C-alpha cells in the first residue's frame, strides 16, 4: 500500500505543478491583453520613414478600430490572399475570415500614410499555443504601393519587440507552402524556424498539408518541452 500511495502522491504533485505552470502562462497572456497599447513602450517604432515611405503606426484592439478600417483590412486580406486560400485545403470563406479578424482577442498594428490612409496592417493575438505563452501573428498585409520597402519587416520587428516586452516565449505564424515569397521572407529574411507543432514536424498530415507553422523565440523562449505535453490550444479565454 505504501508504494501505491507514494505513486499516487507523485502523480498528484505532478498535476499540481503542471496546473501551476499553466496558470502562470495564462497570467502572462492575460496581463498582455490588459495593456492599453503594447506599442506605447516603443515610441520610436510609431514612425517609419525609410525608402520613400512616411507612415505612422498605431496599435489597437479590434474594438478600438473604426468599422471602415476593419472593412479595409478585410478587403485587403481578401485581395491578397483569396487565391492562396483557394489553392489550400482550407478554401476561402468570407464569413469565417471576417469572424477571425473581428474576434474580441484581435489586436492590430495599422500603418497610416499622411495619418489618414491605411496602407498596411498586422492582426495578432496574445495567446497560448501548445502550453506556451505566445504572440500569434494572423496576418501581415500591405497595399501593393508600399511593398518591398521594408515596411513588412518593420511590422514583424514590432511584434517581436512586443512579444519580448510582454514575456511571451515566441512569435508564431502560419504560412502557405505555395506562398513562396512569404515563406522565403519569414524563413530567410526574418530567421523564423519551422515550429515543432507544424504538421511537417509533428507527423500530423505532413506532406499533405499546404501550410507550415513558423516561429521565432524571444529571450524568454527555450527549447524545453511545453507545459501542455504536446496539446495545442488556448486556455485564457
Curated annotation (Swiss-Prot):
One of its GO terms (biological process) is lipid metabolic process. The record marks 139 as: Essential for catalytic activity. Changing residue 211 to A: Does not affect N-alpha-acetyltransferase activity. It holds the Pfam family Acetyltransf_1. Keywords: Acyltransferase, Cytoplasm, Lipoprotein, Myristate, Nucleus, Transferase. Widely expressed; with the highest expression level in liver and the lowest expression in brain (at protein level). It is found in: Cytoplasm; Nucleus. Acetyl-CoA binds at residues 140-142, 148-153, 179. A lipid is attached at residue 2 (N-myristoyl glycine). It is an enzyme of class 2 (transferase). One of its GO terms (cellular component) is nucleus. Belongs to the acetyltransferase family. NAA40 subfamily. This is N-alpha-acetyltransferase 40. The gene is NAA40.
